[in-house]
């Protein structure tokens, strides 16, 4: 195994040297291999996978043509949400937790898996508390809706010689008093106001919780990419490729969760790119702590189980209950198959790229 690995490295080095000699300008030939540059580039490439779902998920206009005024009602989006649940569960039980337990088993002084279990429960509990707090604010806003159109009463009074209520002026009718069919005018104005309120409806806290969990997850990806490039260029390329393949289906599921939470397509894409900044931060931390690898691993060992707890909350508490309300048998089967496919895809990624 070692002989094959060294032969591979020598072969790659020879090809690299030939390409440099034949095609690269003299200015670039003086550059040496700098792991921190490739670490940041790898993290950026992985972060750009956040815009990939824009290609797959249809636009709001296309959904409207299909009869879905709310993107959350789209059958395709519900299938993607099922895929997201499967991907999250597969990521938790086939990648995050096994890696966390492996780290716990290396410490003979601690009870195996106890620390990881506590961090998983902490992640679930903290995400639950945050969602309860912000859901309470949202419920309070829903219980105090905006007043309905009152111009009808005022305008009718005006037309029939009545008096406007004290403090009201003719401007409150917006000039609608001179139009014969006052009721329809006011009704249209009320509908416009309601439509505007729907557009400005605050995004659900589940979307922000998902972004928080993804930021923490991307931080660990940055650590892994930078750590691999510090070992060798070949290890770094393989790690970047493996994480990228792992992230693309993950990003599609995350994108669907953000759409369900009230984000527009472009808002969701921008938010996904912002979470990629955590990957750059993770890469910088790994580079800065490259001389104290064991100490850094000890300090960041809680991140994976905590993220697993957050993913479990999002998948089983936030997304899955809505999917269970599906009444059409055909759609339920499609959603179940998408969930299983999400788990299977994460299993394949784990078998191919985890060591």
Swiss-Prot record:
This is Zinc transporter ZIP13 homolog. It holds the Pfam family Zip. The chain crosses the membrane at residues 37-57, 79-99, 118-138, 273-293, 301-321. It is found in: Basolateral cell membrane; Golgi apparatus membrane. Signal peptide: none annotated. One of its GO terms (cellular component) is Golgi membrane. GO terms for molecular function: iron ion binding; iron ion transmembrane transporter activity; zinc ion transmembrane transporter activity. It comes from the Eukaryota. Keywords: Cell membrane, Glycoprotein, Golgi apparatus, Ion transport, Membrane, Transmembrane, Transmembrane helix, Transport, Zinc, Zinc transport. It is a multi-pass membrane protein. Its main location: membrane. GO terms for biological process: detoxification of zinc ion; intracellular zinc ion homeostasis; iron ion transport; multicellular organismal-level iron ion homeostasis; zinc ion transmembrane transport. PANTHER family: ZINC TRANSPORTER SLC39A7 HISTIDINE-RICH MEMBRANE PROTEIN KE4, ZINC TRANSPORTER ZIP13. Involved in zinc transport and homeostasis. Belongs to the ZIP transporter (TC 2.A.5) family. KE4/Catsup subfamily. InterPro entries: ZIP. Glycans are attached at residues 4, 218. The keyword Endoplasmic reticulum does not apply.
